[in-house]
Amino acid sequence: MVEGTSQMFITGPAVVKSVTGEDVTAEKLGGAMTHNSISGVSHFIAKDDEDCLNQIRYLLGFLPSNNMEEAPIVDTGDDPMRMDESLNALLPDNSNAAYDMYDVIKSIVDNGEYYDVLAHYAKNIITCFARFDGQTVGIIANQPKFMAGCLDINASDKSSRFIRFCDAFNIPLVNLVDVPGFLPGVQQEYGGIIRHGAKMLFAYSEATVPKVTVITRKAYGGSYLAMCSQDLGADQVFAWPTSEIAVMGPAGAANIIFRKDPDKEQKTAEYVEEFATPYKAAERGFVDAVIEPKQTRPYVINALAMLASKREARPAKKHANIPL
């Protein structure tokens, strides 16, 4: 949608005024920013008509001509084995401190280029197109800068739609995970977070394209399942050494386990040191490799190359029964 000229609504401002008494402009009711940031109806926003056409051309460059073809492979000139040393120092020492997941994306994709989908809507999760060694991928990433990267109703809808789109057009999925949980709250429960969150699990489990998951920090409980864990069909799972893979945070778990223990503080510290790592999960086969952050790009590219011939046979169905 184009700012200032594009508008969409079921009933216009005059009808809204006559029925509800609310005064609202056409731009505020159904303008470009309204549908890009509040309703989620529009996926992209443009400054003017020329910018809109340029964005359409750029988007089509990532996509195949139809669902029977593969996405085009482009020579981007970026070394597939390139490593960015800055990634090793990106995450803050405090595991509860925020960082910008876009910094990770820019460091690992070809030439740092990506195309955001619904950039202004549900900012706690990122959905974008990018390339690895010239191959189009769809990236789904938690954004710790907003709501600590928690999944909520809008984030679940946004990511589910994107996952299914990528699967429909044979575009591999790369998932960057730093998720502490589903957003708690009365309004989330009343709004059906269980039903909306289930859409993500359904979309991932239904997708037959290659799926590569990289855990950067937190991967807790059901929210990690919803971000394409191995159990949801991830073909390859990599974890940074900073990863915490568990049902809940180790500090919270220790407070429950040792709440009546006289040496609670010491045992809590020992528990956190032992379990706030990806190595227990790796021992059990839930993680394929623990990697240095700077190695993320070559590992993802190698995984995608290995999965290039992946094919899954599914029962013929008219359509699946997603929990709408």
What residue spans do the PLM features occupy?
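Ligand-binding clefts of soluble mixed alpha/beta catalytic domains
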Residues: 1-324
